[in-house]
Amino acid sequence: MNIKSILTNLVLILCISIASSAQELLPTSTTGQIVKHTYYTLSYCEKDEQSEWVYYELTSEMVKGRQPRTDDYRPDEKVSNVSEQLEDYRHSGYDRGHLCPAGDMKLNLTSMSESFYLSNMSPQVKEFNDGIWNTLEERVRRWALTCGRIYVVTGGVLTSNKGKIGPDRVSIPKYFYKVIYDPRGKGKMIAFLIPNEKSEKPLQDYVVTVDSLESLTGIDFFPELPDSIENHLESSKDVSSWSFHK
């Protein structure tokens, strides 16, 4: 076997190892319908016609990617009994808000295109989507650049909604959340819970404990972490180890 073949095999083994590690950190599903795409995994809630969570690994390489937006919004054929359609958002007054943002999926054409499945969308107030939610997305990308690799879980809180839109009755969450885990060293975790409305407040005002978010959603976000690590990280809302200013 030549050196090129050996290096190729080593890279393949490393990629498989990373993918396996990411899958091991999946949140629990309250719906039983877990859908795996190449660069993210989701748990779909049929009664709300959207995902209760989207989970993915975000690396500095992904953030540095140059793939342009594809804007190819479409139903996710991997979802059983899928009925959510573009028509549901038309003239609704709500944005098709990304859960896993397109800005995180610039690695290649596949990652970018997959981010436009409607299963990765949720109805968001425009000022929220363009405002504080976008600010949080940009901040998460900065953390990925600093940390090299982080894990993100995000979604709307489906236990509380503002009504429905469209013929398929897509729920409008009152709140959206993100949980970010940095596995380096002893690990650190931070969680946000933000109302689906315009806000001028700083992101720090919306930091909550992961424990409180789990109680609200019924989801265990990182069940495969050792209990000693999980219990310590999920009970804290200390922001001192997370940069908000650069």
Language model segments and positions:
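Bacterial N-terminal signal peptides that target proteins for export
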Residues: 1-10
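Domain-level detector for secreted/extracellular nuclease and nuclease-toxin modules, and
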Residues: 14-246
